[in-house]
């Protein structure tokens, strides 16, 4: 088997060298319509790994990426005076046998953060991959909140490009009376 990061022979999806490189991320953030969205990698650094989300090995790749980044963030994250926070994936529909955004939300689980599965659904089946900002604006995701919120929310996705999905999800949660603390993704497509 070959490492999906560098192509070297290894018995895992990612070799030890690639794991070391990916675990030395710098947490950055981007402001989207007043919402701070944290990310771990530039899209250009992990685009080949993210493209596996529609393949059989994708669930393993996303779990490995999350162990190296999101889970480590969750281990050290604590917000005083907030007993519970929900991690909500943007449209965690099962595609290709699993939901990549649900894997990311699950990686955030700690004593304070609890994933809330199947809470936010895109009512539109539009695909944004490779589409322009104009196309995205004309074809909204039309998110719908399917579960009542009992705690503040962290919005979760794999990539942030224009920020429209995060903005639309934030508006959906807020219109239902929920509070969005921030968003978190693996990669920023602008880098």
Please state what every model-predicted region is.
Residues 3-6, 15-18:
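Short cysteine-rich clusters marking metal-coordination/redox-active sites
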Residues 106-114:
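Short helix-loop-beta junction
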Residues 161-162:
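Activation segment
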């Amino acid at each position: 088997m070959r490492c999906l990061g560098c192509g070297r022979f290894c018995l895992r999806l990612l070799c030890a060298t690639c794991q070391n490189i990916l675990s030395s991320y710098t947490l950055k953030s981007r402001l989207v319509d007043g919402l701070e969205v944290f990310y771990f990698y530039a899209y250009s650094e992990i685009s080949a790994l993210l493209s596996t989300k529609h393949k059989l090995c994708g669930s393993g790749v996303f779990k490995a990426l999350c162990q190296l980044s999101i889970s480590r963030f969750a281990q050290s994250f604590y917000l005083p005076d907030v007993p519970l926070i929900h991690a909500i994936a943007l449209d965690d529909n099962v595609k290709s046998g699993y939901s990549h955004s649900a894997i990311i939300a699950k990686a955030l689980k700690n004593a304070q953060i609890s994933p809330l599965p199947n809470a936010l659904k895109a009512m539109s089946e539009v695909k944004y991959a490779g589409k322009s900002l104009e196309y995205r604006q004309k074809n909204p995701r039309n998110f719908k909140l399917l579960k009542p919120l009992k705690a503040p929310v962290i919005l979760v996705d794999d990539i942030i490009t224009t920020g429209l999905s995060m903005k639309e999800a934030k508006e959906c949660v807020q219109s239902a009376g929920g509070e969005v603390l921030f968003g978190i993704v693996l990669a920023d497509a602008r880098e």
